[in-house]
Structures are given as structure tokens and as C-alpha cells.
Amino acid sequence: MLHATIVSTQTELEQIQKLNHQNLKQSLSPEELSKEGFVSWVYSLELLEKMHQLAPSIIVKDNKELVGYALTALKAAGNFHHDLQSMISNIQLVEYQGKPLANYNFYLMGQICIHKDYRGKGIFDLLYQHHKLIYSGDYELLVTEISANNKRSLRAHEKLGFKTTYTYTDNMDEWKVVVWDWI
């Protein structure tokens, strides 16, 4: 049975790392990249542990097996997460509803990933709805960025209600900054 929960064990962090590595852009064939989507950032166990100390991430399990994750990334994680710090720097002045994002109380989605055998089964929505349940009382917005080449992820985020607010290019990719408004 599928159920969403917060990360609570070291084993779950290890399972997140394993799923992350299996779905990295550089680990997939061009066909898989196009059809299945991908993740761009590599997460070490140490980095996951530090992020978890700030705020637990959300996972979906099928009985005891972790089949999806959505990493909670508070802005403070930018102090030890280089890629996240770059993202935060790039989006601080992005405007949302006439105000800079920096004027909102928001946190970031560090990454979302679902085991390929479980895609299309509602896990994406389950992960994000659990984020909303846990964090919407403390935050106005959930912000993330998605590779413009990751069409599957862009469609899934739009379907849930995320709105693209800004597009930029860095040394890695072209990124769409998307916002889920909980106000």
C-alpha cells in the first residue's frame, strides 16, 4: 500500500540517495531522458543528512520500500549546498505577483523523483500534497526550478498548479523557475 510520510530513518536517506543516483541525467540514455524525465543534482548522503536536520523531506513508500521522494530545501541549506545557493541567488529578485520572491516566506523543492516502476500512479501528487499538508502553515510558497528539457516534469508541475515565473540559463542548463502558491 502506498503512503506518504516524512523521512525518519537513516535507511530512508540511503534509499533516497540510491534513487537519486539511478535517475541522474548522466546515468540515462537519450530515450530515457525524453520519456522518463531525469534529475540534475547529485545528492551525497552527507548533504541529505544536513538538509534533513533543517527540515525533513517527504517520501512515499510501498509497504517498506521507498518509491519516491520530494526533498525539502530550506533557504538555510544554501549555506552548505552549492547548487541550491546558486538557485537561491538566481531567484531572489524574480518577481511573483508584482513582488520579489525574497519578500515571500518560501522554501524550495530540492528535487523530486519517483522510481520508474511507480510513475503514473499518483505518487507525484501524493508527494506534493503531503508537502502542502506539512509545510503550508509555515510557508506561503513552494519554489523550484526545472530543466527546460525535462518536459515530463514541467507538465506534471503545471498540472498540479505550479506557475512558471522566470526562465534563465546557467552553465548547466536552461531553467524554469516555478511557484506553487499556498496563500
Which residues does each predicted region cover?
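Conserved active-site alpha-helix within GNAT-family acetyltransferase domains
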Residues: 125, 148-166
